[in-house]
Amino acid sequence: MTEQTPERPHRSPPMADSTARLLTRTTDRLSLVPRNGTPGPMDRTRQPDRPAADGGPPAPSLVAVAHGSRDPEALRTALALLDLVRDLRPGLDVRLGHIELNRPLLPDTLDGLRGADAVLVPLLLGRGHHVKHDLPAATAAAPDVRTRIAAPLGPHPLLVEALYGRLVEAGWDPADEGGRSAAVVLAAAGSRDPDSAQDTRRTAGLLATRLGVPVVPAYASAATPTVPAALRALAARGRHRTFVASYFTAPGRFASACADAVPHRAAAPLGAHPAMARLVLHRYDRARSAPLGGPAAADAVSLLASA
């Protein structure tokens, strides 16, 4: 994958650089899980993950909920991400459940946790149908498990760090791509739920601040614009050096279709990125502190998504 070098390198405007540095500092503060996985100043409210010395209860199990895919790489990616989560939080019981297409299915995972506490962390990027309806339905069908549902992964600055890292891997050079010809299309699955679209737009805005160039959300289904349409619109504005950021947690049909629009400038899905593992634990920590008798699951997800 070779990119042509511009005649004169462009740098991001000073304001964009300053904002990007501020966003990076904010990212580190918002994460309750430091990079080395040891407790830090932001971990004051986090309970130990092993049973307390006085025989106290263990931490709730973390159940990561993936969508599921016919692409075998999707399952391998989810398992690799959960390995990173375990590395960051030794002693925490981390399990996987799928909404469809792959085993273990979520009901089977919950069935193995009867009588226990669990926090469901959706490996999903916005407040769509699965988060609002499928997850609450699954917990209602498992009354023997004391469950809390975490917010979806997006939007959050840690997602932006993962997106940025994947773009750099695909050839994005911050020193060269800050000029008037550069832009990014944030390729997402798409949903008819307006909250999901809003979450994608918020992530696009955060990524634009991080990169210092326009970032346009586009969709593989159920919403507009499509990725090819977004690329054409950017080209009409003189933005010809356009990369596609893959706003998918794992490989799959939609991710591949979006990447095919610009195969030489398409980033990989978020996958098993260190920032993703930190974000999974951040969502887990926020949800485990919420009361079991709090708001209805869908309302609680909406509240937590802003954190």
What are these regions (language model features)?
Residues 1-307:
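Active-site-proximal alpha-helix that buttresses catalytic centers in soluble enzyme cores
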